[in-house]
Amino acid sequence: MIDKVFNKSITKQFEFDEEVASVFDDMLNRSVPFYKEMQRLSINFACNFLSENDKVYDLGCSTASTLIELSKHCKHNLKLIGIDNSDAMLKRASNKAKAFGVEIELINADLHDVTYNDAKLILSNYTLQFIRPLQREKLVKKIYDSLDEKGIFIFSEKVISTNSNLNKQCIDEYYEFKKTQGYSEFEISQKREALENVLIPYTEDENKKMIKDAGFSHCETIFKWVNFATFIAIK
């Protein structure tokens, strides 16, 4: 389905409800620049670290597209676990996994309440930015503690610049991108308002500091487009 969530006046803050879940895949592809390329790169990097029967968690798995793609492209059999707190998302994830013949354990839970046992890889695509900063850093420390030795954490985030002029230019460039994807000025402004105080981005350096503070030995930016970035962190 085509994303038309914000072509009407908003009455609430952004949330991953049934309306959003029904168009989420289209929303991602049209709202996140080079989303498919980011996903491809993340999977390629992940596959280089994975072995037979490794356990993989996707935090905020939404419709499970990344886990499904990982299963298709990785030569190993993996234990795939998707976690989300939206019933609507998990229902679609379950249907998609069945359609593609991919076995995924789907868990409806708050990310802070899950025990990530024996994880070799933890994924988080545009999820941390929706978690309040103090809780975000606690979760990243939990991720670090849960990973096997030499486990990896791959995550993507919207980022901001410390330079106000550059930050405005980045935002303007992003909105121009959204227009090329068929979103109107009204839809763009409505979504911006709905995300106010819901999505809280860090700078690229702040993300890397958070990772280092959690204990990771290395963090690298493997993809970036203006104010969207993908990182790989190695335990």
Swiss-Prot record:
Its EC number is 2.1.3.-. Disulfide bonds: none annotated. Keywords: S-adenosyl-L-methionine, Transferase. One of its GO terms (molecular function) is carboxyl- or carbamoyltransferase activity. InterPro entries: CmoA, Methyltransf_25, SAM-dependent_MTases_sf. It holds the Pfam family Methyltransf_25. CDD domains: AdoMet_MTases. It comes from the Bacteria. It catalyses: prephenate + S-adenosyl-L-methionine = carboxy-S-adenosyl-L-methionine + 3-phenylpyruvate + H2O. GO terms for biological process: tRNA wobble uridine modification. S-adenosyl-L-methionine binds at residues 35, 60-62, 84-85, 110-111, 125, 192. Homodimer. Belongs to the class I-like SAM-binding methyltransferase superfamily. Cx-SAM synthase family. PANTHER family: CARBOXY-S-ADENOSYL-L-METHIONINE SYNTHASE (PTHR43861:SF2), TRANS-ACONITATE 2-METHYLTRANSFERASE-RELATED (PTHR43861). Catalyzes the conversion of S-adenosyl-L-methionine (SAM) to carboxy-S-adenosyl-L-methionine (Cx-SAM). This is Carboxy-S-adenosyl-L-methionine synthase. The gene is cmoA.
